[in-house]
Each structure stands twice: as structure tokens, then as C-alpha cells.
């Protein structure tokens, strides 16, 4: 057991040793052969993560910071933290491409060039790295303002703009969509998307898969949250006219939308609140988990009995259709008491899976061994 130590230098860097006792993992249930440990704790509402070529883990925290976590001795626990951006608004999304770190605010997207080079030369006189504005014309409505960022293999940056409401129609077409930033142009990838805060590209087909949070106040069991697949850009996924596979909205369902609605490929359940997702194509986990999608169910907030609060694993056939979905990690919800809220999974280059938790303020590390 390690003892927690902290040292702050110039307010930007913290050295620490993870205290396993700070988070009780005994109640968590995993599939056979898997173990869960703490990669980093004492964080501040961590959400999306991205890994640099040198193994640095970048994290968007909901409190207005983007941090870098460094496991210098490669023991599976972060031992230092550097704040690379602060004083941000709704700072959850992060993505890396070609050595540059991209991160979000509610209405802006920034980047820091050669971020790991800056980290490698960091000292107490470094100050904060220079950030460059990439996108600055997004809506600033706070309702569903959290962003998820993801680059495709060509360097196009994908991000979400959630609906500014529970259910409504807006004159601004950017709302309720997933867009990509391509050569200074904004392209609509998916429309009619109420609030997606998790998407990833299939490792083989490169198709975009995304979750969507269903609307509220239609009862405990309706409508379902969704997992969707984009077959071509510009498809319309129903909001606000239609929810899940078959539920027409009581207010907007009779309107002529002018769109063909695309049904979800998987209904996840009402109010489970899917957030981050990550496809797995590493070598540590069993072979049958190749190209599975891990989906964080953040958990309900307005249901008479709580649901969600777990990480699930979704299997697909060769056509990208869902074959099976099952719990991968559960146990954060017990007797209506919640000990954690899984936020976003991320596969590390070593094949392990990181999982952020913005209630327990930790990042877990999940590993596999046949002897476990």
C-alpha cells in the first residue's frame, strides 16, 4: 500500500502516489479473469481521456481543466499530474492527432501543438503551454453543452452539439448533431441526435458508432437511450420527432420532419445515460473481445429506482450489427446507493482499459490475466 504524497510546483504540477485504500473496489463485479485497480485518484470530475505516443494520459475535467497524467515507472499507476489548460468552460472533451492535443469548451475547441514535447521539457518556470483556437462559432447554451472529441484516421475532428433542452426544435441547425471539422468547414455527420457524449470508429470498417441520451419525463421506462451507427453522413436519427425505435414524441411526433428516421442498432434502456465509448482492438483481452465496444452507462438522475452505473460490452457481427450486450463491470449501484459513475473508457496502447469516474474522482485500470 502506498502513502499519498503531494507536491505543488508553480501551481501546475503535482507528484503523487495512488492510494488504493482511497477507493473501495471490493463491490465491483467484473467478467472472469479481469482485475480492476486505481490508475489515478484525487481528480476533479474526470471525463474523456486520450493517450499520447509517449504514454501520457490527457484528461478533460469538468471543473475547467485539462490535465496530463504520467506513469513514469510504468507500474500501472500515475505518479505525476500536470495541468496543461485551465479556466475553461465545460472542459470535458480531449483528442490527440499528430502530436497535437485538442480540447473543448462549451462553444470553442482549442489545440496545443506538440504537447508531449512541451511536457518532456517542463520545469517550474514553464508556465502554461500556448493554446491555439481551432473552432469558435459553436453555440454557448449550457444545457447538453459537454463535448466529446474524436479524430478520424485522416485528421478530421468530430464533435457533438447537444440539444439546448429536454425536447425542442431549434432554428440553429448545429444543435442536436454530430459534426466534423474538415479544412475549416463544418460538415454534418449525424442529425437528430439529442445528446451524444460518446462516439468511436470501428477498427475495421471505420464507421462511426455513437450513443444518444433519451429525453426525460415520459416515465421510468421510456424512451430508451440508444446506440447508433452512421452509414453515411447526414443521416437523421429522430430527435425531437421520434425516440428510440418506435416512440413518437407526444409534442413533435405528428409534425412532418422531412427526414427518414434511422433506428438505433441497440436500445440501452431508459435513463441509463450512456456517456463515453471505446472500441477494443488491443492484445491483452481475450481474442473474442476484439472489436467489441465498451459503453459507460453513467446512471439515472430522475427515475424512481436507479438504473445504469456500469460499463457494458457490446459484440457485433461482420456487418456491424449487434450480436450481444452484457455487463463488463458493475457494482457501483447497490441498494439504491451509488458509489461511482463510470464516465468514459479508453483503451491504452498496452491493451489495458482505463475508465474515468466523475463521482469517485478516479480513473480505474482494468487488466486481464488467465490466472486472475
What is each PLM-predicted segment?
Residues 23-30, 146, 163-166, 181, ...:
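Beta-propeller domain segments
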Residues 90, 95-97, 107-152, 160-164, ...:
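Asp-box/WD-like beta-propeller blade repeats and closely related beta-sheet repeat scaffolds
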Residues 56-60, 100-103, 156-160, 207-211, ...:
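Conserved beta-propeller blade signature
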Residues 69-75, 112-125, 231-237, 313-321, ...:
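Short loop/turn segments immediately following beta-strands, especially the blade-tip
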Residues 24-41, 74-87, 115-140, 171-198, ...:
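Blade-edge beta-strand/turn elements of extracellular beta-propeller
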Residues 65-68, 100, 108-110, 177-179, ...:
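A short loop-to-beta-strand structural motif that recurs across blades of beta-propeller domains
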Amino acid at each position: 500500500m502506498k502513502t499519498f504524497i503531494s507536491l505543488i510546483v508553480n501551481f501546475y504540477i503535482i507528484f503523487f502516489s495512488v492510494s488504493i485504500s482511497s477507493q473501495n473496489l471490493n463491490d465491483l463485479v467484473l467478467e472472469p479473469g479481469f482485475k480492476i485497480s486505481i490508475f489515478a485518484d484525487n481528480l476533479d470530475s474526470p471525463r474523456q481521456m486520450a493517450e499520447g505516443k509517449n504514454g501520457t494520459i490527457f484528461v478533460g475535467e469538468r471543473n475547467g481543466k485539462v490535465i496530463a497524467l504520467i506513469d513514469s515507472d510504468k507500474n500501472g499507476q500515475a505518479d505525476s499530474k500536470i495541468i496543461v489548460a485551465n479556466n475553461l468552460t465545460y472542459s470535458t472533451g480531449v483528442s490527440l492527432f499528430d502530436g497535437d492535443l485538442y480540447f473543448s469548451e462549451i462553444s470553442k475547441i482549442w489545440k496545443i501543438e506538440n504537447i508531449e514535447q512541451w511536457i518532456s521539457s517542463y520545469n517550474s518556470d514553464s508556465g502554461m503551454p500556448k493554446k491555439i483556437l481551432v473552432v469558435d462559432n459553436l453555440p454557448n447554451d449550457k444545457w447538453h453543452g459537454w463535448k466529446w472529441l474524436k479524430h478520424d484516421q485522416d485528421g478530421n475532428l468530430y464533435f457533438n452539439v447537444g440539444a439546448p433542452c429536454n425536447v425542442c426544435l431549434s432554428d440553429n441547425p448545429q444543435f442536436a448533431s454530430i459534426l466534423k471539422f474538415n479544412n475549416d468547414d463544418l460538415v454534418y455527420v449525424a442529425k437528430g441526435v439529442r445528446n451524444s457524449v460518446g462516439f468511436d470508429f470501428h477498427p475495421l470498417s471505420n464507421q462511426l458508432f455513437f450513443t444518444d441520451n433519451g429525453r426525460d419525463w415520459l416515465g421510468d421506462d421510456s424512451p430508451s437511450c440508444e446506440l447508433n451507427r452512421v452509414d453515411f453522413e447526414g443521416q437523421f436519427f429522430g430527435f425531437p420527432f421520434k425516440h428510440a425505435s418506435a416512440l413518437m414524441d407526444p409534442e413533435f411526433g405528428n409534425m412532418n420532419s422531412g427526414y427518414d428516421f434511422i433506428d438505433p442498432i441497440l436500445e440501452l434502456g431508459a435513463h441509463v445515460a450512456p456517456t463515453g465509448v471505446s472500441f477494443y482492438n488491443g492484445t491483452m483481452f481475450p481474442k473474442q473481445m476484439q472489436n467489441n465496444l465498451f459503453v459507460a452507462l453513467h446512471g439515472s438522475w430522475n427515475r424512481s429506482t436507479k438504473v445504469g452505473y456500469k460499463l457494458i460490452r457490446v459484440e457485433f457481427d461482420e456487418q456491424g450489427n449487434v450480436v450481444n450486450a452484457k455487463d463488463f463491470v458493475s457494482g457501483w449501484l447497490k441498494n439504491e446507493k451509488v458509489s461511482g459513475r463510470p464516465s468514459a473508457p479508453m483503451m491504452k496502447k498496452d491493451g489495458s482499459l482505463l475508465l474515468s469516474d466523475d463521482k469517485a474522482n478516479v480513473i480505474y485500470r482494468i487488466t486481464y490475466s488467465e490466472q486472475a
